[in-house]
């Protein structure tokens, strides 16, 4: 009986999620979200356990591992090798010099291992993003807030001179996450 009660308590947050949007609207929002999170500007840092940021699909020539022997290791900041902040300084200045190391108003680092998107399918990333165990502990509202407020996300949409970016703005993807969540976060 205790096991049944525990299972019901664990399932309650998903069951309690109000679905105010249609499944079709949620799937359309997910398609727009995936278009953004699968862009190389995002996947080149969302690399998972390899800890090696990439320079893929950005118009710099052949796809390759980030230069300078960068390895994020378990710290995600490269503390055991070349720290990200060796080149990616923390500053609020605009990124105006083409191909210079980008900078933001936060300490440069890779996302947590659980947020690996490089080489993953839409269904895999969808399952990751809807599960707090694999999305850095966020519910839908917290995901949307992260997308609106993260200096990393803001930089990804406006990376500066000579750099490609996904279409839209942080507000666009945050609004789509809210629609997707209101539809029950459907994946297919």
Region locations from a protein language model:
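N-terminal export/targeting leaders of redox proteins
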Residues: 1-34, 54, 70, 94-188
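Mid-chain, structured segments of secreted extracytoplasmic proteins
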Residues: 61-102
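Intrinsically disordered, low-complexity regions enriched for glutamine and histidine
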Residues: 15-16, 44, 64, 86
